[in-house]
Amino acid sequence: MAPKKDVKKPAAAAAPAPAPAPAPAPAPAKPKEPAIDLKSIKIEFSKEQQDDFKEAFLLFDRTGDAKITLSQVGDIVRALGQNPTNAEINKILGNPSKEEMNAKKITFEEFLPMLQAAANNKDQGTFEDFVEGLRVFDKEGNGTVMGAELRHVLATLGEKMTEEEVEELMKGQEDSNGCINYEAFVKHIMSV
């Protein structure tokens, strides 16, 4: 049998190249949530509570002028038992710039409606919410999570923490196997 000849097929007519796709439109900027009108907030704290809050407020005063910077508001609100996210604090503050956060100062009278706004927020997680969130990482089902995994989660998911913040939070929490009892950890966090 004779070898087959390699018959070349005529090249198909080249189709014109499609026009390049237009660049995708930039994603619309997420609108900032409107700031909370602090003047409309009714203070519901007792006189005794307000005195305690003022005492705590003054502990954060670094210059002796009875004022704090906006960057300290979240720390004081949390020290007084509330648990707002940084985004919630920014909304309460009116979404200030980084420069304003470090430069602008407020008095206790300006701070009190901010604290009340945080206290009025009902979306704060409970002990059970936090434990349930950590239970997902409990591979053994024994009430513990790996410290390294928890560090990674805290630094990369949700409202990300810096390495320094993570280390400060986890100080003294790991056992000799590098595991953390997450119920005790949540109690620790909620008491800080």
Curated annotation (Swiss-Prot):
Keyword Repeat in annotation: yes
Region (Disordered): 1-34
Name of the protein in its database record: Myosin light chain 1, skeletal muscle isoform
Cited PANTHER family: MYOSIN LIGHT CHAIN 1, 3, MYOSIN LIGHT CHAIN 1_3, SKELETAL MUSCLE ISOFORM
UniProt-listed InterPro entries: CALM/Myosin/TropC-like, EF-hand-dom_pair, EF_hand_dom
Assembly mode: Myosin is a hexamer of 2 heavy chains and 4 light chains.
Residue ranges annotated for the EF-hand domain, each copy included: 48-83, 86-121, 125-160, 160-192
One of the record's GO cellular component terms: contractile muscle fiber
Biased composition range(s): Pro residues: 17-29
